[in-house]
């Protein structure tokens, strides 16, 4: 950075949570010209009739007043509906398990919101994500957050070089425990507020109830691969590969898991055993691949690296073979359990997040598995 902090304007995306509150506090203490902005992306009254966005914005106002920075709210409900929620519904309709947080970061936080921040004369957009940006070389690199348990690069895999150039992650070098301590030391209003979970901006509501408002559920047969009927499912969209909870199959022996779906016949396939061979695959096809910087893949279109197929999963050694501009086959060194179409595959080289894509089809012994 060539500008001095006091001449550098940073817009902080504030959610009303402790992470973004501490991000804003740190930047203010470092001397930056900081503006706090709250994004309203969803008309969200929860099951109890409480509008959580109103509560969150009130917390943003309290924190901004405490640390002495201006604050605003912006509304991206239409963009969120068009770019994220519609995709989310379409994927569920297709029997897949989407990751709306990845799409939200790609289309809203680091696209629509970043553009808005730059239009306000901001030099950077900062968020409370657990990730790091390395600007020491010619290209900007995105690194995992220092707190391995909280690292969020999995959800940020679609960020491009142009976006990373304009982004700051102030808490990426901290452990969650330290973030809480800093908030308490500064007596921030959000210091003891619990972390939000649930879908990006939709929050912690009953998922089945929520989804059924938009997609009519179609109950059907739940059976083994040999055709033995085990009960009825509530609708294929409510189940994901490797799922154990909510199947309602009694009896003795090993627990039951979802091992496949037949969308045309509306059948949910289940089998017993956590390590059931049907849950393991050897390769995937991936689409919508994006790299965090150019020239990551060799001229032969291949790359050897590690990958995650779901959040907080250990890294798996893989070989990536590009089959198109944004498509690839990803071959695993060892079989991996419960790799699920619609989820993100994210590539790493040590601490660096190289990029990622969406899992399309899943293969074993050269055969496509009946995952949708």
Curated annotation (Swiss-Prot):
The active site is at residues 104, 200. It catalyses: S-sulfanyl-L-cysteinyl-[protein] + uridine(34) in tRNA + AH2 + ATP = 2-thiouridine(34) in tRNA + L-cysteinyl-[protein] + A + AMP + diphosphate + H(+). GO terms for molecular function: ATP binding; tRNA binding; tRNA-uridine 2-sulfurtransferase activity. Keywords: ATP-binding, Cytoplasm, Disulfide bond, Nucleotide-binding, RNA-binding, Transferase, tRNA processing, tRNA-binding. GO terms for biological process: tRNA wobble position uridine thiolation. Transmembrane segments: none annotated. Residues 99-101 are annotated as: Interaction with target base in tRNA. ATP binds at residues 13-20, 39, 128. SUPFAM superfamilies: Adenine nucleotide alpha hydrolases-like. The record marks 129, 343 as: Interaction with tRNA. It is found in: Cytoplasm. Residues 150-152, 310-311 are annotated as: Interaction with tRNA. Its EC number is 2.8.1.13. Disulfide bonds join 104-200. Belongs to the MnmA/TRMU family. Catalyzes the 2-thiolation of uridine at the wobble position (U34) of tRNA, leading to the formation of s(2)U34. This is tRNA-specific 2-thiouridylase MnmA. It comes from Bacillus pumilus (strain SAFR-032).
């Amino acid at each position: 950075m060539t500008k001095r902090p006091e001449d550098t304007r940073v817009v902080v995306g504030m959610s009303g949570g402790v992470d973004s509150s501490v991000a804003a506090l740190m930047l203010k203490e470092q001397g930056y010209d900081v503006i706090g902005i709250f994004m309203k992306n969803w008309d969200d009254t929860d099951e109890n009739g409480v509008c959580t966005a109103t509560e969150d914005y009130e917390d943003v106002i309290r924190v901004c007043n405490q640390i002495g920075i201006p604050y605003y709210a912006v509304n991206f409900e239409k963009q969120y509906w068009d770019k994220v929620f519609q995709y989310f519904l379409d994927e569920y309709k297709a029997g897949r398990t989407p990751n709306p947080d990845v799409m939200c970061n790609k289309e809203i936080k680091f696209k629509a919101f970043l553009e808005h921040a730059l239009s306000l004369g901001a030099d950077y957009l900062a968020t409370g994500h657990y990730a790091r940006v390395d600007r020491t070389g010619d290209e900007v690199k995105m690194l995992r957050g220092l707190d391995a348990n909280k690292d969020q690069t999995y959800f940020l895999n679609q960020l491009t070089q142009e976006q990373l150039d304009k982004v700051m992650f102030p808490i990426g070098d901290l452990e969650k425990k330290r973030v809480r301590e800093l908030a308490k030391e500064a007596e921030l209003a959000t210091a003891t507020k619990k972390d939000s979970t649930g879908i990006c901006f939709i929050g912690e509501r009953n998922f089945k109830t929520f989804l059924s408002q938009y997609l009519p559920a179609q109950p059907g047969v739940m059976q083994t691969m040999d055709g033995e009927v085990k009960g009825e499912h509530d609708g294929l969209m409510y189940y994901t590969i490797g799922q154990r909870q909510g199947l309602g199959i009694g009896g003795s022996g090993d627990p039951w898991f979802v091992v496949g779906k037949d969308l045309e016949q509306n059948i949910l396939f289940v089998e017993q055993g956590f390590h059931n061979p049907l849950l393991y695959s050897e390769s995937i096809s991936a689409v919508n691949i994006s790299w965090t910087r150019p020239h990551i893949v060799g001229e032969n279109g291949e790359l050897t690296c590690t990958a995650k197929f779901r959040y907080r999963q250990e890294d798996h050694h893989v070989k990536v073979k590009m089959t198109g501009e944004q498509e690839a086959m990803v071959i695993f060194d060892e079989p991996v359990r419960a790799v699920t179409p619609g989820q993100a595959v994210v590539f790493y080289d040590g601490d660096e997040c190289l990029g990622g894509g969406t899992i399309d089809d899943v293969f074993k012994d050269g055969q496509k598995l009946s995952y949708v």
